[in-house]
Amino acid sequence: MSDRHISEHFETLAIHAGNTADPLTGAVVPPIYQVSTYKQDGVGGLRGGYEYSRSANPTRTALEENLAALEGGSRGLAFASGLAAEDCLLRTLLGPGDHVVIPNDAYGGTFRLFAKVVSRWGVEWSVADTSDPSAVRAALTPKTKAVWVETPSNPLLGITDIAAVAQVAHEAGARLVVDNTFATPYLQQPLSLGADVVLHSLTKYMGGHSDVVGGALIVNDQELGEQLAFHQNAMGAVAGPFDSWLVLRGTKTLAVRMDRHSENATKIADMLTRHARVTSVLYPGLPEHPGHEVAAKQMRAFGGMISFRVEGGEEAAVQVCNRAKVFTLGESLGGVESLIEHPGRMTHASTAGSALEVPADLVRLSVGIENVDDLLEDLQQALG
């Protein structure tokens, strides 16, 4: 029975897809195949298609099968980081003279990749408010090969109607790439809504424990999958076996973790909306969020990420970050522990002076799975 027919239920797929019992010992958890090369049965006689671990490794294969099943795709590819996955994708899709549309609130690392690296390839790019399909359409050119979307976006929690933007992109002959890092496949499945490629930083919710760095691409198009696999092997920025094992462990509990992240975040967002020092709360679960209806349509729940703006400007926002005690001041997101950061000085510093620059008074929360009362109390004392 193939993985996609184990069950239609996400929680069951997360535990069983790609997790075949070890044929030698019966171990229910796939081993960490910490190996670089494989014995051949005669010249070219490969066992299971394995010859060199840059090309393929059984532990990585298990993870890639798991990721494909969870996103409803036919091919998953695991990389050494989310940016390594982005780099492979861009090298596969684009050449000199091509054009890409990216969000006007993209992740700082993605912006840096386009601004400092991709532009040197002779590739053109422009920004658009992807929450507005007409703005995406206006940004298209005859050379556009891809439209890039984050939803929810990092760090402004913007929401893009995936199905609507997919239609706009496809009408122009472009592919739609969706960064699904904030939502995860448990909350949102972009391929089912018309996306061509789903991107993940596995470092975040998929790993879920702040102990691994990784990235992934998932597609349904077999030809595109083969092209990506060729570039993955040619470039070599693959996920190692132990990293693959850590993420595979993480995906098993993804559903229960995301339920708790979302539950805690909803309560925290509600508290922040009523706090006198908070001027704005950015969380798609709030009815007043401009993307709430779209998010409710395409997401199972609203996730664990919140951003908010603080009265008093940049220094006040920094002070809130520094005063937190249960929330750890640090970059990244998606672990079981709650994190707080100042995007303008930390994760999104590379956007300063650009169209993607984030507000100086912005604070970003990655809400963990601790007792929510402790988190609420910590934020209240940090805000003063």
Residue ranges of predicted features:
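Conserved N-terminal alpha-helix of the aminotransferase class I/II PLP-enzyme fold
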Residues: 37-87, 109-116
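Positively charged, small/polar-rich N-terminal and surface patches that mediate targeting and assembly
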Residues: 2-7, 11, 58, 270, ...
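PLP-dependent enzyme catalytic core of the Aspartate aminotransferase-like
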Residues: 115, 124, 145, 322, ...
